[in-house]
Amino acid sequence: MQAVETPVLGQVHYRDLREWLALVEGFGELTHVKGADWHLELGAISELNYRRKPTPALLFDEIKGHQPGFRVLTASSSSSRRLGTCLRLSTDLTDAELVEALRGRPLRWEQSAPRYAPRVVSDGPILENVREGAAVDLSLFPVPFWHEHDGGRYIGTGCSIITCDPDTGATNVGAYRCMLIDDRTISVQIIPGKHGRVHYEKWFAKEGRAPLVVALGGDPLLTILSGLEVPTGISELNY
């Protein structure tokens, strides 16, 4: 067995998903797909792509029945280079180098998380397009019907669901499935035992409702963290 040298990690800078897409396209791992149908075709293309080696990220646009610019990204972190970029480690890590780069880091991230509280800001691109009340229309989004026997169209697969504990204010970010019910409603599936489920059960016991945020198209790093088992007491927003 050949030893793997500890990789030299450079600083990777990107502010949002758009800048991340530009980085990935720059090193040749982004494929544009135009004109796919949200009903099964988008999911089938994505499934076949996952079986390819190497596996590029796919950016779907001009999806059937929807305006250009309403896009869907799949396979965002399905290569060492893209995962290393998401984690802001390096843009050119091999599989072995990524494993070496991550050695011991999760524990250090857990230990240092309390020192990195989220910073609340009053402005940002997320506030450029706002729809409230009767103007809410989820049909604008090209929500895929991914697989033949799915129960519906899932808008939340690579997503971040943010909840908080009503007693302590502690936050949690999880990747829970969200299904489109109608133009104004989605359902969120959080199985028992998950931190988000603990939070909303507390809210329902107190007020009969539970506030939460469904974040789509955010920083790819947050999407990855949403799927991790971060220990109780540590928020993914700090981690």
Question: Each predicted region: which residue ranges?
Answer:
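Extended, highly charged
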Residues: M1-Y239
